[in-house]
Amino acid sequence: MYSGEMTMVILLLIGLVAQSNLIAICASVLLIVQFSKMDFLFPYLETHGLELGLLFLLLSILVPIATDRVTTRDLLYNVSSLPGFLSIVGGILATHLNSEGLKLMQIDPSIIFGLIVGSVIGIIFFNGQPVGPLMAAGVAALFIEVLNWFH
């Protein structure tokens, strides 16, 4: 068995043990693609997978606005209040961290395994919520940058 396939099997097992359906499903899908000789899909998934994931994430976030559960009045109040202002600042910082995390994963794709293991530990022991490796990579990039200040 190739190391990529073995890593996917390990991630599948980690996902099952940690009850992280997303990790288990992703590892399973990639194993199926590999074993069914449809590996021509890998470049497409690598190039467009993040965009597709963000598309579905944004769709789920915008549904309350589209269905009027969040009104224009709610939105205006939110952006003009202190919590709303802080959420805007949080969004700015988060997108910057995500950008740095994406750069880190492009420079060193092997870092994803550590991000997933860390996410699983966070889920199991700290009641964390997995939102994907991009934010975890952003935080890791921040830690690496801080460490570089001292070297």
Curated annotation (Swiss-Prot):
Pfam families: DUF441. It is a multi-pass membrane protein. Its main location: membrane. The chain crosses the membrane at residues 9-29, 47-67, 75-95, 111-131. GO terms for cellular component: plasma membrane. Keywords: Cell membrane, Membrane, Transmembrane, Transmembrane helix. InterPro entries: UPF0756_TM (IPR007382). It is found in: Cell membrane. Belongs to the UPF0756 family. PANTHER family: UPF0756 MEMBRANE PROTEIN YEAL. HAMAP family: UPF0756. This is UPF0756 membrane protein Dred_1676. It comes from Desulforamulus reducens (strain ATCC BAA-1160 / DSM 100696 / MI-1). The lineage of its organism: Bacteria, Bacillati, Bacillota, Clostridia, Eubacteriales.
